A protein has these predicted regions:
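An alpha-helical appendage that flanks or caps ligand/catalytic pockets
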Residues: 125-161, 202-305, 337-351
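Active-site mouth loops of central-metabolism enzymes
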Residues: 7-21, 79-87, 168-178, 279-285
Length: 351
């Protein structure tokens, strides 16, 4: 198992620079500790999620972070394609590929509630139709040796091209919802499936099953190692200490994101911190408890390649969050490294 970071920025600082500096501090630390990749949240197209310190342009942040780090790969998590012209996205990605010396990963998605978002006007096409065509057009712009004509359902043009072309063959991550079509497209194109921390363990298992089946259909050897799964992870001395540091901040965020966990007829009062720990959304406590929690989820879903630690939040203090990352990489990650989701499973005698 590899370890990555999902910098899911949500600190509610009055000054954006304060949050950006803290996010940079975490990325720099992650790079020093050997964390392999970081996906940087891009929030700027959905009115209900607006905060004074949100990051509406992850690419700019990534280019600055690249000058302060050595090995970590970074990508936006994600660019909502229906709100941009695909050639602009293709160009932005190519430039970032050059500016990061090939450490840039493209991150695409439909966007949260794209159809009802009026901040940039009403979309004239179905957002998923726009997303699919945008992906095809971006790939064409990256790969076409000569200017090309495009006559799609959404975009049309003649002699299109981008300058510069990408320097490398970038990895592309797709924000995967529980939609079959998104997971199937991800497998069809050979992209990386990015799974947020909000799906239940059962939903992650189902999403991985759809992805693996779709990989098989396109004739590829299905590889669970390409799947990225996010979870809130916090390492300290005890579960009690973790609850004290995490409870207020994370419950406030969870109320807006975890409605699917509330039982029929229930309310936010059912989203207790203890229940969210029991359901595997928050994995916290001493190193052994954290390892066991991650291993249990890994086994329940059938394995995955990269665990994305959720950062960019306002729980505890910056020092506590950094200490958690340091302890995780020193005391938990080495034990997880032995997990290989693509290794054939050997059935026990009891089975």
């Amino acid at each position: 198992m590899q370890i990555g970071l999902f910098s899911n920025g949500n600190r509610n600082n009055a000054l954006a620079k304060t949050s950006y500096d803290e996010d940079l501090h975490e990325i720099i630390l992650a790079d020093r500790l050997g964390i392999s990749e970081a996906w940087i949240s891009e929030h700027g197209t959905f009115l209900a999620y607006q905060r004074p310190d949100q990051l509406p342009s992850a690419d700019l942040f990534i280019c600055k972070a690249a000058t302060l780090t050595k090995q970590i790969r970074m990508g936006p998590g994600i660019r909502p394609l229906p709100f941009f012209h695909p050639l602009q996205i293709a160009t932005d990605c190519a430039v970032c590929d050059h500016l990061t010396d090939g450490r840039y990963m493209a991150g695409f998605g439909v966007g949260i509630n794209a159809q009802s978002n009026k901040q940039r006007g009403t979309l004239v096409h179905d957002p998923r139709t726009m997303f699919r065509e945008a992906v095809d057009l971006i790939l064409k712009a990256w790969e076409a040796p000569e200017p090309f004509d495009w006559n799609g359902a959404v975009w049309q043009g003649e002699k299109w091209h981008i300058i510069p072309k990408p320097m490398t063959k970038m990895e592309v991550g797709i924000a995967c919802s529980r939609s079959d079509t998104t997971l199937e497209l991800t497998a069809e194109k050979g992209f990386l499936p990015l799974m947020s921390w909000t799906p239940t363990v059962a939903q992650v298992r189902e999403m991985l099953s759809i992805y693996m089946s779709s990989e098989h259909k396109r004739g590829a050897v299905p590889a669970r190692s390409r799947a990225r799964v996010g979870r809130v992870v916090y390492v300290c001395d005890s579960v009690a200490e973790a609850k004290r540091d995490l409870r207020d901040a994370e419950l406030a965020h969870a109320y807006n994101r975890m409605q699917h966990v509330i039982p029929p007829g229930g309310s936010n009062a059912d989203l207790t911190f203890e229940k969210l720990i029991d359901r595997g959304f928050f994995i916290c406590g001493d190193p052994d408890t954290v390892y066991d929690g991650i291993k249990n989820i890994y086994d329940e879903v059938g394995g995955f390649g990269t665990l994305l630690l959720i950062y960019g939040k306002d729980w505890g203090t910056l020092e506590q969050r950094c200490r958690s990352m340091e302890r995780f990489m020193a005391e938990v990650a080495p034990r997880l490294a032995a997990l290989n989701p693509d290794k054939p499973r050997v059935a026990s005698a009891a089975e």
